Swiss-Prot record:
Family listed: Belongs to the comF family.
Leader sequence segment: 1-22
UniProt protein name: G8 domain-containing protein DDB_G0288475
Lineage: Eukaryota, Amoebozoa, Evosea, Eumycetozoa, Dictyostelia
Compartmental location: Secreted
A single Gene Ontology CC term: extracellular region
Organism: Dictyostelium discoideum (Social amoeba)
Length: 1119
């Protein structure tokens, strides 16, 4: 009896405690409402005139002990107990007299001629003696490329290749005490601005460490930027973010509001805290097991007093006829699952909420569907037919850009756009370094004061953020007043909450923190899932922060608008189009930053890249190449977005078929071109893979025979057609008004057709790598900007590298700027040249595949215009391009650039440029032609022979040429040279008895006049054929002279007893076979028009198919 009474009392107390909030609601009347939140912009303090000191702390966790020897993993250990920010240096016996403490993390940028302080406390572990006496301490700032990478795992300090950018050595200091920490301050005054650097402290003793282990203690080591007066505002604030292109921006006005439409004003609402609406007659309590079902046909209003704000509710189900409506009043709800079949309302399009509403998702990691079948656990799921509307206060713009460079130590920044941000909110200032993951310099800052476009932070910036005319670091608002987040303990499992919508959904003004469930498909922070074509769905001005898995996902859903959102610190692809069937969606004015791959980033040592297969630790294998925007189907609109960091900023993988839930949809996703790609920006990406880029059209994603996804990160061709079907006809993939900077290859396109119109590229290794029929026009390609962090020898700059075979590349209306000679370069390819040849291969050789027109080169020495590496390969010997107006050559007439061999010196207009390693000639009426000379079993297209497999030479002859103008020929087929000239082909092993000439590129109206040596008394059968029909098959007849052959119709040959003369013309052509853009033209490589030459000689028959012993004699110069 006593036990029963006690139990009843306990239940009563538990009920009272858990309903204390409900009991505080004054009324259950349908007319009662809590006081709704209102918003008055808080008054900001004035901008303070003093910026505080910035201390960059150095300790055990961000230092590496290095030396030539005498180091180990325990060379640095914890400091003495009770001494804050301290560490111990442990010296082994007979170690070297010198060692280094190298900083693992980026250090602040330092201005020339300003004073900085390096300080530390120091104490000897043993009494001062001959083996622990310090002679000097030196503080050094090195270019990262010059010393051992402190994050690379090695403690061996490589002797720097070059002197430190700045160094300060002191030989006196408080280094002798073994009883107390003595303070040391070293003043640093750099003589040059220091951008990206590695700080290394060299400690030198008077001798080796001796026979006994010694220790030294260091406390509170730091690099300090002293407090100073806030500088006067710059007079040259950026007002236009680009010089050439136009990056669109959202409307400046706030979304229209009408408070009379707010959902909490409806007269037919009932209160959550009204026990009479519940079938049990009791207001539901937080519980670890109960499913709270909203009464059918009811619109239930939640007020702060309605619920317990500390207990965890297990699950809420909203039936199809019901609605759950939140009041615009601040509250916190802890929940595991919410299942929406009806409506979930927390503000609307016309009634954004002002309250601070915090929804905290709780729950341990599981793959059990606790929300509903297929909808997972720990989050909100909206069923097909359901509706969700969540609208927080609008902060606009959600992101902007710097209007001036911000230095390390600054606590005031200037931005370009009007914003209505407020004191106390957090922003992220994006990085201005190339390798975002290696040197993490994104900074989350808190607003202390804001006056118009001037923002002051509570603390100084640690790093340098560039805001020059070329480009400017983004500044994005992270804070929102409605927050969906997971409990902080979820970080250990990366199992956060998720929001999944299979019906219609409208989201605006939400911050999502620690959301997503790592490697569980379909469990993303904000996710439209298999909703088909929607009519009123959008995600606007939200933020995703510290996501475990993605940001904003569109999965098998069309017609969604995703606009003005931001994301920061994200694992896996961020803005994510999942299966390849997603079309007609609009992603506009969004920002993604600091996006991390899952697992080791995809790399590889050649164009193939690497292969990855789906696994429990990599549910989507393409996440090894995670980027800001992942686009499995290009037929969507991308307008005014920006991506900072990631493997790529924008990634277009190739899908031969949809994947996942959409695997049976009968389309080929990779055949769709971009619907709209306008005004997008990407930077600080593309560097994990040699062939990576910030906008990457490449890689392949498919479903294997075992049902697992397979991803290849490398070169995959992409054909694009109108409406995504081959019968629709070929169409070019187009990128308009694009900016790339601090990038590897800017825009990387492995496909067959691409147009890049209006491009700015700054501080990138290359502006792009464009394959197929490619046109780059109206661009600025800037090798070096004013960004201090980009002034490094870590990577070279190339204006554009022409490919080596079977493409067509046209560059028009381009300004190349600031390609400055690198005195440390070892070849033209790393010497910051404007036009670069590709010379590594003998198997792949260029035809006429590259052309330019209207090129302007600024801030660049003429010697830097062309970078051609002389290499013993066909691709080096046959490098060529046409400068259609002579703006590169400076001749003001169409010009042919040819490689280093005299083979390219075809007339008296040709001059050799030693800086360029190239011949430069007036084009005149000539074209560049290419012929594949094949000898079955010896020289054929299927062979892959060594570059040194020389078989002879090709010479120019006739036209008054008397000297030797030749080029090596190897067993790898393909000879490119000048049309309408004599080509004399000599084999050192003897002339083959059968030769097949594929006229791969002999343009319409032009020819090649061949001369080939044979022994006397040889007879010939010469014919031509087109593989695909017999209309142009001819048997050649013998002419009366070589001159008659050259002036003839291309169906004759002549043998003068030493040389066979054959004029080859492609009879299939009609003059339409070319790719033309911007006033430049490249002729097609035309497949399989063949000339056959069969030689017979009974007097001196061939030996193993070759006529040997022939003299190498140039034909007459008068021909």
């Amino acid at each position: 009896m006593k036990y029963s009474s006690f139990l009843l009392l306990f239940i009563y107390i538990f009920f009272i405690l858990n309903n204390i909030n409900a009991q505080s609601c004054p009324s259950t009347s349908s007319t009662w409402r809590p006081t709704m939140a209102s918003f008055v912009t808080p008054t900001s303090p004035s901008i303070a005139t003093i910026q505080p000191q910035l201390d960059f702390l150095l300790g055990k966790n961000n230092l590496v002990f290095m030396g030539q020897y005498g180091y180990s993993a325990t060379s640095i250990t914890d400091g003495p107990t009770g001494v804050a920010n301290s560490f111990t240096m442990n010296y082994d016996t007979w170690g070297p007299a010198m060692h280094w403490l190298v900083v693992k993390t980026p250090v602040p940028a330092l201005k020339a001629n300003q004073n900085y302080e390096f300080s530390f406390g120091f104490k000897l572990g043993q009494v001062l003696g001959s083996y622990n006496k310090i002679a000097s301490i030196s503080v050094n700032f090195f270019n990262p490329a010059d010393i051992t990478d402190p994050n690379g795992g090695s403690q061996y300090f490589v002797t720097p290749a070059h002197p430190a950018v700045y160094s300060k050595t002191v030989t006196t200091g408080s280094w002798t005490s073994s009883t107390t920490f003595a303070q040391n301050i070293i003043t640093l005054t750099p003589t040059v601005d220091i951008g990206l650097s590695i700080m290394a402290i060299q400690i030198t003793r008077t001798s080796q460490t001796g026979p006994a282990i010694t220790t030294m203690f260091v406390s509170n080591m730091k690099l300090s930027i002293p407090s100073r007066t806030v500088p006067a505002p710059p007079t040259n604030l950026i007002t236009k973010d680009s010089e050439l292109i136009a990056i669109p921006k959202p409307l400046s006005s706030l979304d229209a509001q009408d408070s009379t439409t707010c959902p909490y004003l409806a007269t037919d609402l009932v209160h959550w805290h009204d026990p009479t609406i519940w079938t049990s007659g009791v207001v539901p309590l937080p519980s670890t097991s109960s499913n709270i079902i909203i009464p059918a046909g009811k619109k239930v209003l939640i007020s702060p007093c309605s619920i317990n704000q500390t207990g965890i509710y297990q699950k809420i189900t909203i039936p199809a006829t019901s609605e759950l409506i939140f009041a615009d009043a601040s509250l916190t709800m802890n929940i595991q699952d919410i299942y929406v079949q009806g409506k979930f309302i927390m503000g609307t399009t016309k009634c954004r909420y002002n309250a601070n509403i915090n929804i905290v998702f709780n729950g341990a990691m599981t793959t059990v569907d606790t929300i509903a079948q297929y909808f997972g656990s720990k989050g909100i799921a909206v069923a097909s037919g359901g509706f969700i509307s969540v609208h927080g206060r609008q902060y606009h713009n959600t992101w902007t850009k710097l209007a001036a460079t911000a230095w390390s130590g600054d606590n005031v920044i200037y931005i370009q756009d009007d914003v209505n941000w407020i004191v106390g909110q957090q922003v992220v200032v994006a990085t201005s370094v190339y390798q975002d993951e290696k040197y993490p310099e994104n900074e989350v800052m808190t607003i202390a004061a804001i006056q118009g476009k001037v923002i002051q932070f509570t603390e100084p910036l640690k790093y340098y953020h560039y805001g020059g005319q070329e480009y400017q670091a983004e500044v994005a608002l992270l804070t929102r007043n409605i927050v969906f987040q997971s409990e902080s303990s979820s970080a250990a499992s990366s199992f956060g909450g998720h929001v999944l919508v299979s019906g219609e959904g409208q989201f605006a003004g939400i911050q999502l923190i620690r959301m997503g469930q790592r490697n569980i498909k379909g469990r993303y922070p904000l996710h439209f899932h298999m909703a088909n074509t929607v009519s009123k769905s959008y995600i606007s001005d939200c933020s995703v922060v510290s996501s475990y898995y993605r940001c904003y996902t569109i999965h098998a859903t069309n017609n969604v608008t995703v606009t003005r959102n931001v994301a920061f610190d994200v694992n896996g692809h961020c803005y994510y189009l999942e299966d390849g069937v997603e079309m007609d969606n609009t992603l506009s004015f969004n920002f993604a930053s600091y996006v991390h791959t899952i697992g080791t980033p995809a790399a590889g040592y050649n164009q193939y890249g690497q292969d990855f297969t789906q696994s429990s630790s990599l549910a989507q294998p393409a996440d090894v190449a995670a980027g800001g925007f992942y686009i499995t189907n290009a037929w969507n609109s991308f307008i005014g977005n920006a991506a900072s960091g990631g493997w790529a900023g924008f990634s277009f993988p190739n899908l031969d078929a949809p994947i996942g839930n959409s695997i049976n949809v009968p389309i080929v996703p990779k055949q769709f071109t971009t619907k709209v790609f306008q005004g997008n920006t990407a930077h600080s990406s593309g560097y994990f893979f040699e062939f990576g880029s910030s906008i990457y059209v490449g890689g392949d994603l498919s479903t294997g025979s075992d049902g697992l996804l397979v991803y290849n990160s490398g070169r995959i061709s992409r054909e694009t057609y109108l409406n995504g079907v081959e019968s629709g006809g070929e169409i070019w993939m187009r990128f308009n008004n694009t900016k790339v900077y601090l990038s590897n290859r800017g825009i990387g396109m492995w496909g067959e057709r691409v147009e890049v119109i209006l491009l700015e590229s700054h501080d990138s290794i290359r502006p792009g790598s464009l394959f197929g029929e490619a046109w780059l026009s109206d661009a600025i390609v800037n090798g070096q900007t004013g960004n201090l962090l980009s002034k490094t020898t870590d990577y070279s700059r190339q204006g554009f590298q022409f490919y080596d075979t079977y493409v067509k590349t046209i560059l028009t209306n381009i300004i190349f700027r600031n390609f400055v000679h690198n005195p440390l370069s070892t070849s033209p390819e790393d010497d910051n040249r404007v036009i670069i040849s590709m010379t590594h291969s003998d198997e792949f050789k260029p035809q006429f595949i590259s052309a330019t027109k209207n090129i302007t080169i600024q801030g660049t020495a003429v010697s830097q215009y062309i970078g051609h590496r002389i290499f013993d390969t066909g691709s080096s010997r046959q490098f060529n391009f046409v400068d259609y107006d002579g703006t590169i050559s400076g001749r003001s007439v169409p010009t042919i650039f040819g490689a280093h061999d005299k083979w390219w010196q075809f007339d008296n207009t040709c001059t050799y440029n030693n800086d360029w390693n190239s011949w430069v000639c007036n084009k005149g009426t000539y074209e560049v032609a290419s012929v594949s000379v094949e000898v079955p079993g010896y020289m054929d297209r299927s062979g892959e022979y060594d570059a040194t497999s020389n078989v002879g030479y090709i010479y120019l002859f006739g036209s008054g040429i008397t000297d030797s103008r030749r080029m090596n020929v190897t067993r790898n087929v393909g000879i490119t040279g000048i049309s309408d000239f004599g080509w004399y082909l000599y084999w050192t092993v003897g002339t083959p008895s059968y030769i097949k000439l594929w006229l791969s590129e002999v343009p319409y109206g032009h020819y090649v006049f061949f001369a080939i040596p044979y022994p006397a008394s040889t007879t010939f059968k010469v014919s031509c054929e087109y593989k695909y029909n017999s209309q142009h098959s001819y048997n050649f007849t013998q002419a009366t002279s070589a001159a008659a052959v050259r002036s003839g119709d291309g169906k004759k040959y002549y043998f003068n007893g030493t040389h066979l003369f054959v004029k080859v013309i492609n009879f299939v052509l009609n003059g339409s076979e070319y790719f033309s853009r911007g006033g430049a033209k490249i002729n097609d490589v035309y497949w399989e028009f063949i000339v056959h030459i069969t030689a017979t000689n009974t007097v001196k028959p061939p030996v193993n198919g070759f006529y040997t012993g022939l003299t190498d004699v140039l034909p007459s110069s008068t021909l």
